[in-house]
């Protein structure tokens, strides 16, 4: 399946100069959604994944069914103040300013094999924060998987030496 054909591209959203990749068209197409989840599962099936981590919010959409298919646990990474128990945090830079992500302190056990699943790789800032927290808790990141990668932003290079997979690539 050509997933790129299933992703709606909206020019000038949310502001002029942005080419927005709308994944809702993948989510509401049952064949495209199944293909996406199955392709990520296929990439991860031999990695003995214990935990799938999904960053807020669209990482939840793909990470949860991937975890289910692998027989793994799912752990959400949330924005600051959204998790009820003790957390660890990581700050990352945005275009203007910064933001903070958090994960429950007891969500990842030392030595667990972790796959991170998200919708889009852009600059790599969010993913570096997620990786930092997982490794701080003792998890081993075995793969980082995306539906979309914006290759011109070089997020893959900024993430570094991890197994990184994306299903669709765009040069922006």
From Swiss-Prot:
Function text: Catalyzes a salvage reaction resulting in the formation of AMP, that is energically less costly than de novo synthesis.
Compartment(s) of residence: Cytoplasm
Subunit composition and interactions: Homodimer.
Catalyzed reactions per annotation: AMP + diphosphate = 5-phospho-alpha-D-ribose 1-diphosphate + adenine
Family, similarity comment: Belongs to the purine/pyrimidine phosphoribosyltransferase family.
Any one GO BP annotation for this protein: AMP salvage
EC number: 2.4.2.7
Pathway: Purine metabolism; AMP biosynthesis via salvage pathway; AMP from adenine: step 1/1
Lineage of producing organism: Bacteria, Bacillati, Bacillota, Clostridia, Eubacteriales
Superkingdom to which the source organism belongs: Bacteria
Any one GO MF annotation of this record: AMP binding
Organism: Clostridium novyi (strain NT)
Any one GO CC term of the record: cytoplasm
Keywords assigned by UniProt, alphabetized: Cytoplasm, Glycosyltransferase, Purine salvage, Transferase
Protein name: Adenine phosphoribosyltransferase
UniProt cross-references to Pfam families, sorted A to Z: Pribosyltran
Chief subcellular location: cytoplasm
């Amino acid at each position: 399946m050509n997933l790129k054909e299933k992703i709606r591209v909206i020019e000038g959203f949310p502001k002029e100069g942005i080419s927005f990749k709308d994944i809702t068209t993948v989510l509401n197409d049952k064949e495209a959604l199944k293909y996406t989840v199955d392709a990520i599962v296929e990439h991860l099936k031999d990695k003995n994944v214990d935990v799938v981590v999904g960053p807020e919010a669209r990482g939840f959409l793909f990470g949860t069914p991937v975890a289910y298919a692998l027989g793994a646990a799912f752990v959400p990474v949330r924005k600051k103040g959204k998790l009820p128990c003790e957390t660890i945090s990581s700050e990352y830079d945005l275009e203007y300013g910064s933001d903070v992500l958090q994960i429950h302190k007891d969500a990842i056990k030392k030595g667990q094999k972790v796959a991170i699943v998200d919708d889009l790789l852009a600059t790599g800032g969010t993913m570096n924060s997620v990786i930092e927290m997982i490794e701080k808790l003792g998890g081993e990141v075995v793969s980082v998987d995306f539906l979309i990668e914006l290759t011109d932003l070089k997020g893959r290079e900024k993430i570094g030496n991890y197994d990184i997979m994306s299903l669709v690539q765009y040069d922006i």
